[in-house]
Amino acid sequence: LKEYALAGEAMATNLIAQDSQVNQVDSLTEAWAKPLAQQTLNQAKVSIKIDDDASRFNVNNLYHDGKVDDTALAFFQALLQANGLSPNIAMAVLDWQDPDSDARADGGAEAAYYQSTGKKMAMGIANQPFISINELQQVRGMDNEGLQKLAPYLTAVPYYLPMNINTVKPELLTILVNLPTEANGNQPQGSNRADSDDNSQSGQD
């Protein structure tokens, strides 16, 4: 199975490389965004789907370059509310990734909080960017049900990644345009290179 997965990844990478030579603007009208014909490799059938990470909200946008991104925070809180979740979860998500041990007000949680709950955790609080959105299940106020609601709209890229206006999911665009003017200082951009193939499923690993 690994052999076929690697072959599919290689084909997806080649297609993205070809697209990069044509232009640096990703949109859903390009060849990579269209369903690819099923490939047969050694009598096995391989399906390939390429997705743009920038069509989702990157949870690591909340804290980057040593500070909180207020625009990203307002957006994430609105996304939480739109899915019936508490906006306070955003504070716990921030505390999970920032490097200090000071819990934020309104729902924040550092190592002391998790230790006090007696909750068994596979790892301690990360104090670094999220590696996978599955880590969110460990965060105060979040559970698997909440993650399933958010998963289609999230990704975890270890650097700042603005949403791509050409590929962003409609639900996220609706939230963006309804943000207060003072919070809407980080419009999504139209040129990003953060594509992934179907095997990585940027929304949820």
Q: Which sequence ranges carry the predicted segments?
A:
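Compositionally biased linear targeting/interaction segments
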Residues: L1-D205
